[in-house]
Amino acid sequence: MLIWTAAGPEGGGMDAVLDGVTLAAAATGAFVDTRVHRIGKKRFRALYQVFDSNASNPMGHCGAGHEIRMFVYDLTSPKPIERGRILVSSCLESVSLASQNAGRPYSESDFSSVIWRGDGFTIEWWGNGPGGVTSSHYALRNGRFVPTRSSEGNR
């Protein structure tokens, strides 16, 4: 079963996968979690947008690298509403998901380290993630996904 669908300039338009949401202007592509995640009566979907790390200096530090941000949308009619964004992979900040460093083919598009739970989702980091932690939990609070411990930054 296909869980993450490529979208963007080469992968096709966003409307076919997440109607009502367009990529950020600087995004070079995206992966859409095709699953709908429920928290209470609300439904959510994750969109992973890919950006160049150092677009203004492609020969410099991380010039060929990428930054990936997870955008979480509340699937509210008539248009999805963004409820959070988290940096999940970064050449510049040396942050990455555990699943993207598993050494398997296509692991760069493996977002299985984002695990949805009853009140939000947990991210398992490769090595030490933001703030030196190995995992971070984000919960839905007052309409936004926020870290559940103050030591975990919402990057």
Residue spans for each PLM region:
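Exposed acidic/polar residues on beta-strands and adjacent loops within beta-sheet cores, strongest
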Residues: 1-155
